[in-house]
């Protein structure tokens, strides 16, 4: 029977449409028993192909296509692994090819267990190679020209499932080669997956011996994977078990903890670790963290369930004492659930490459590698790549891809988005392009590198998996799942920028304050830091900077570190429903139900609420006598909602509880509660470790805010300036002679850096810093290199006021810039004594200057216009930070944004405003009645007094606005003869409600009155209405 050997898969990136799952399905439909893959140079899909075939009852045949230079001729070879030995040889051959090291001598040394096929298209009778081979023939091969001494074998290339796919493959070739469709060669036909029986009949008729050769070749092919664990030996000269014991004992003694219950807990953990064969693993992790600390890097407090291990704490792998904080080792590792321990190594993100080099040098480049991932055609990428080849312009592509949401597939966005569907159906070529995009969506586009994963092995990695060359170290061709399935150790090196922040803050405190802070020794009950959490002042704090977490902190107001840990766990779906119960029970406003005295100590710290997975395990241990290992199995069954396992466990739980004298009814009720909570209970060890890291960051924010904001703005984002301004920092005005490159904070002043100026070349910024001081605008321009004498580079410097020291009128410099550039380039060198003749012009207003600064660097650098208004204001107002719920207040603000909606009941318009008072933001609601009055006066960017009632919603204060008044000095002045027409004037003014104050001056008795209850919207219509009753109107 025919066997399909030469199948290119999607792992021959953009040269095939054969994905493995559909390949298995179609092969069975077409009557195949044996199928193969033969990707060019790589084995990316080999493991999943072999396993997938075995699962689907198909015989896998693994092949590899390579081209090799021999005797000045490129020879195309198809290599077939005939057995497990041949499979291992292919791993090595592919690795050599993907590393640029494959040559004929190497190939010949690795041909044991491999059959070689040379396709007839690449064969000639002059070809002489130092090994035996088959000639691969397809339906179109002229058999009369074949070498009668060589064995023939059927070989048909497959790249797609059906002829209809040819157009899609043509598109992929165009994308791959970055060509238009017209420039891309057409795809060869007859490369579809054909019916097995038809091909068998064809070869039986035309070349029966070739078919027999094929049957003989594949008849005994079978591959076996070695899945045994292959941990590297940490030290071949010493027992890992003994070394781990020595190190952990020394670690506890150094911490002053060589006493009970630490000694017995340590022995218990060491026995389990040794019995499970993981001694070397812990030593390797210890070694890696030791390397980081030797370099002075802050390695954090650990993460995940590993924080429950005393061995990890003794080795300084984690920074949390699991005995003191009641963390469970069995949540991390136990003999009743055999799995690799999973200790993720957190490290400062800026040093990750140094760790990779250390692993490579310490354990060997043949024993360690990074792990491959595959970037696929996402919906946006597929649309962009395909539609571009149909000649769709960029602006249309952008408009179309904007309609695709983060979680959308092309099918779902087409179904739910009317506008997207309308665009697709608007043109025939769009419909065609969309069909192609859907066909390639999800297919691999290129390789990438796993963000964290590293694989390590005791022996050479290519004995187990194929590799390819990389920058810092080799990269696996197998993905993380296939790597671990082959028994290899995968470790995650997670570059955590929060560790970088903490380390840089520690360094800056030492430099600026001469104070050495031991980060690991920071008191987790520090009152000032706890107060910061209680206020929800946690912007920039790991795990706590999103609005949901901030609002939760404001509600809970943590009074001790344990409650910060609880907040982490409550800030999750399901658990958050118990926040009110948690607070009321803590304050004694709600009864705490501890169910049974025997489990009361487990539930008391969380006021009777099961927040943590470990609590479920402890209850199973104490109440039903489960071992902690068995309790962890129960926890897993509950969290995964494994109904069959849970039913079995429930009966076991009830029986065990009854055996200990518990009431059956109580036991069943308790199990149901455990089952409910386990579905969303959080890993306490992980919550504790990450809350500790958050607390360390918050410690710097509480005690050294200038250092905190300096690091956050320079290593993370200048967006943190908003938070800094709310904390009473001020943006300082800088000059061309003083502006730093990065942001700098000194004495509560923020000096924005040149790096914030959008579009400013870094080299130009460095040039400015190196060349200063400058003596004038002319001096700066004269010395500026010609390549930077462009308005696109110079105008932002002028608009943010860097030349105000020389010429405060920014508009004047801008209007004269063309003339200045001519002067410095043409006249300045000829007439060095001459000076530039400036043309005067009116400067920008303070508001315009501030807006320009915001546009260019993201924040105003000069005095905020609102501050000037506040200083001159005669009206009483309340800062947003001092607002109190359920009170009436007036605020002086600037409107950031206006969102208008229609009510569901009446269909009337109302508005939601986002406003600020330079330090804090506030949400404001105008209901239909108020919005109808003031809508013509409201404008984004303008300044107003808002009067209204302060409400609390979702634990945030907001205002329901009743009155709006423009915060400007202009007033509407009316000059009238006397009081004769007061009633008429009052009636007219009342018909034009607005935000402008009105002042009436009576000429006859020299009396001036400022109206307190009437404000107007000044229009031409108002002036016309007043004309018969007033002598004059002035708006100023």
Swiss-Prot record:
Keyword flag Ribosomal protein: no
Subunit structure: DNA polymerase III contains a core (composed of alpha, epsilon and theta chains) that associates with a tau subunit. This core dimerizes to form the PolIII' complex. PolIII' associates with the gamma complex (composed of gamma, delta, delta', psi and chi chains) and with the beta chain to form the complete DNA polymerase III complex.
Protein family membership: Belongs to the DNA polymerase type-C family. DnaE subfamily.
Keywords, comma-separated and alphabetical: Cytoplasm, DNA replication, DNA-directed DNA polymerase, Nucleotidyltransferase, Transferase
SMART domains linked to this entry: POLIIIAc
Protein name per UniProt: DNA polymerase III subunit alpha
Location relative to the cell: Cytoplasm
A GO molecular-function descriptor: 3'-5' exonuclease activity
Gene name, Swiss-Prot/TrEMBL: dnaE
One of the GO BP terms on file: DNA replication
EC number: 2.7.7.7
One Pfam family matching this protein: PHP
InterPro entries recorded: DNA_pol3_alpha_NTPase_dom (IPR011708), DNA_pol3_alpha_thumb_dom (IPR041931), DNA_pol3_finger (IPR040982), DnaE2/DnaE/PolC (IPR004805), DNAPol_HHH (IPR029460), NA-bd_OB-fold (IPR012340), NA-bd_OB_tRNA (IPR004365), PHP_dom (IPR004013)
Keyword Nucleotidyltransferase: yes
Class in the EC hierarchy, top level: transferase
Example of a GO cellular component annotation carried by this entry: cytoplasm
Catalytic activity from the UniProt record: DNA(n) + a 2'-deoxyribonucleoside 5'-triphosphate = DNA(n+1) + diphosphate
Reported function: DNA polymerase III is a complex, multichain enzyme responsible for most of the replicative synthesis in bacteria. This DNA polymerase also exhibits 3' to 5' exonuclease activity. The alpha chain is the DNA polymerase.
